[in-house]
Structure formats: structure tokens, C-alpha cells
UniProtKB/Swiss-Prot annotation:
Keywords: Cytoplasm, Methylation, Protein biosynthesis. PANTHER family: CLASS I PEPTIDE CHAIN RELEASE FACTOR, PEPTIDE CHAIN RELEASE FACTOR 2. This is Peptide chain release factor 2. It comes from the Bacteria. Peptide chain release factor 2 directs the termination of translation in response to the peptide chain termination codons UGA and UAA. The modification N5-methylglutamine is found at Q251. It is found in: Cytoplasm. Pfam families: PCRF, RF-1. It comes from Helicobacter pylori (strain J99 / ATCC 700824).
Length: 363
């Protein structure tokens, strides 16, 4: 990097910083935080528990956004000032340090951009994830299990919690399907764009001739809704099936029919849960999954972008990302059009760069 390149970078980042300020309006955030704090001083504030909870969540969000913005702006202002002084004094040591820290400065601006993008209605929610293998038997079932592990490792990296709702073992390897929740701040906001078909190309570990195989798996993401969000489900529109839990969904395979499957006739959505020994709890979890999927479907219709992928054949259409392990190694996202070479790390859950790249591309 040289003086001209760094100078252009600073101009670009300052322009982004100005645009961010126009969007988030830091002074208005400060005023809103003052208003919330005064409201919380009222002795009657906690009488309405739901309203108090929502107000407190908003306070935390605004505080975090303001703090992230201020930290970014301070770093940028300091870099601009240091750059001018170093140029005037021909201070090569300081200039070299500024060049080294340029990626960190860029990342701090991008972090605020991501915060802004994660301010949608349900972005702060937990994420319900369903993974289904495509055609291809063991190959696709193994690929589905690799994706499942990838998301679990991502959750671990972010210190998020996960909870299995339903798990069906594959016939020889992998899984026939899995549904689980990732619980953490902005989990849904980060993962919402993972909806779609994921494609794997590799030398098959199940082929004695070591041929290259292509496998597909479908990932569906929906927000975990708060209990106070009202989604009406007409009993005549659903069928409940009860069966014995099996597989890794719970190491304790029940002798009673505690697992629950719900079919919603109008949409064709099917959800199931077997993570608990209690049929009642499994039914409640399955209903929550169904409500979340119906809610997301309605939002998509309102936005005129319904993409009901659970009704589509899992194959070449609707692909969002390709993971190629042979003859070369590369992960490429169709939305951001960015290719990544650190395939092993990605499959081990290092997917933040991919998720953020898609958020920026779709902004």
C-alpha cells in the first residue's frame, strides 16, 4: 500500500461513515435512549411485563449500535489525523503502521454496516433451521450432516446455544433430516439468507472407484417467534401424527409415541419434533416451528418475493452456494458472487465472512 491508495481508502470510509450517520442519526439515538431511561424510572414501568421486555431489548440494541458507531468513527477520525501528521513529517514508521491497520479499520466500518442491516423486524430472533438432503441417497444424506455440523460449529464460535427439535439418521451415513434452533443475538438476522439449496462437489468417500459426485441439500431458516405473536392455526387445516422417537434426536428411544409430526394442508408444510420425552412438549415445539414457518411465508408474500422452496425439487434450481472439494477447493456464493478458498475452515463453521458478504450484496 502507498500514500495514494491509503488516502483513497480513507475517503471511501469517510463517505461510508457519513452515510451511516444519515441512516442511524446518532443524536436521535441518544435522545431515544434518554427517553427510555426516563420511562424506566417510572415505578409503574414493569407492570406491563411484555412492553417492559420489548423496551429493554430496544435499549440494548440502540446502545450497542451507538457504541459500535462511535468506536468506528473515533478510529477513523484518529487515522485521518495521524495520516496527515505522518505525511507532513515524512514519518515512514507511522505510515507503515497505518497501512498495516487498514484492514482492521475497514472491518470496523463494515461491522456498523452489518449492525444496520440486522435491524429488521425479526433479525434479533433465534433461528429455526431445517436441513433436508436432496436425491442421491447416502451421498446427499452425508452432505446434509456436514452442513448440520457447519452450522453447529458456527454457533459454538459465536457462543450461541443450539437445541435439536428433530433428527433422523441416514440409512448408511449422514441424516435424512434435522430441525434445530440456534439461540443467540441476531441469529436469524445472520442466517436468514441461508435459505436455499447448497451444492457439494467432491470425490465420494462411498464410491470404491473414487469418482466425483455432486450432492444437494436444502436449508430452510425461519425466526423463532415470541409467544405473544398471534398466528392463528385452524385445527381443521392440520393433522397430528404421533410416533416413537428414534435416532440421535434423543439417545433415549421412547417406548411411548412421544414424537409429533404436524402437517399443514393449505401450505403443505410438515414439521416434526422428538427432542423431549414429553409428547405435550414436543407438540408445543412443533407448533412453534409451524407458526414460525407460516409467519415467514406470510412476510415473503407481503414482500412479493415468496420462495416456497420446500415445494421445489432439490436439484440445480434455487442454488445459493456451491462447495467444491475436487478437482479444486472453493466455496462460491451465488448472491455475493464471492469465492472463498478456505473450504476446510468454512465447513468447520467459519462462515461469518460469507454471511456478511451476502448481507452486503443484498442491501
Amino acid at each position: 500500500m502507498d500514500n495514494y491508495t491509503y488516502s483513497e481508502l480513507l475517503k471511501s470510509l469517510q463517505n461510508k461513515c457519513d452515510n451511516i450517520a444519515l441512516i442511524i442519526k446518532p443524536e436521535k439515538i441518544k435522545q431515544e435512549l434518554e427517553r427510555i431511561e426516563k420511562e424506566q424510572e417510572d415505578p409503574n414501568f414493569w407492570q406491563d411485563v411484555l412492553k417492559a421486555r420489548d423496551t429493554n431489548k430496544e435499549k440494548v440494541r440502540l446502545n450497542r449500535l451507538l457504541e459500535t458507531y462511535q468506536k468506528m468513527k473515533n478510529s477513523l477520525d484518529e487515522s485521518v489525523e495521524l495520516f496527515e501528521l505522518a505525511q507532513n513529517d515524512s514519518d515512514e514508521v507511522t505510515l507503515s503502521l497505518l497501512y498495516e491497520e487498514a484492514p482492521t479499520l475497514e472491518h470496523s466500518v463494515q461491522k456498523v454496516e452489518i449492525e444496520i442491516m440486522l435491524s429488521g423486524e425479526n433479525d434479533a430472533s433465534n433461528a429455526i433451521i431445517t436441513i433436508q438432503p436432496g436425491a442421491g441417497g447416502t451421498e446427499s444424506q452425508d452432505w446434509a450432516s456436514i452442513l448440520y455440523r457447519m452450522y453447529l460449529r458456527w454457533a459454538e464460535r459465536k457462543s450461541f446455544k443450539s437445541e435439536i427439535l428433530d433428527y433422523q439418521d441416514g440409512e448408511e451415513a449422514g441424516i435424512k433430516g434435522v430441525a434445530f434452533i440456534i439461540k443467540g443475538e441476531n441469529a436469524y438476522g445472520y442466517l436468514k439468507n441461508e435459505n436455499g439449496v447448497h451444492r457439494l462437489v467432491r470425490i465420494s468417500p462411498f464410491d470404491a472407484n473414487a469418482k466425483r459426485h455432486t450432492s444437494f441439500a436444502s436449508v430452510q431458516i425461519s425466526p423463532e417467534l415470541d409467544d405473544d405473536i398471534d398466528i392463528e392455526i385452524d385445527e381443521k387445516d392440520v393433522r397430528y401424527d404421533y410416533y416413537r422417537a428414534s435416532g440421535a434426536g434423543g439417545q433415549h428411544v421412547n417406548k411411548t409415541e412421544s414424537a409429533v409430526r404436524i402437517t399443514h394442508f393449505p401450505t403443505g408444510i410438515v414439521v416434526q419434533c422428538q427432542n423431549d420425552r414429553s409428547q405435550h412438549k414436543n407438540k408445543a415445539s412443533a407448533l412453534k416451528m409451524l407458526k414460525s414457518k407460516l409467519y415467514e411465508l406470510e412476510l415473503e408474500k407481503q414482500q412479493s418475493s415468496a420462495k416456497n422452496e420446500e415445494k421445489s425439487e432439490i436439484g440445480w434450481g434455487h442454488q445459493i452456494r456451491s462447495y467444491v472439494l475436487a478437482p479444486y477447493q472453493q466455496v462460491k456464493d451465488a448472491r455475493s458472487n464471492i469465492a472463498y478458498s478456505n473450504v476446510e475452515a468454512i465447513l468447520d463453521g467459519d462462515i461469518d465472512a460469507i454471511l456478511e458478504g451476502v448481507l452486503i450484496a443484498k442491501a
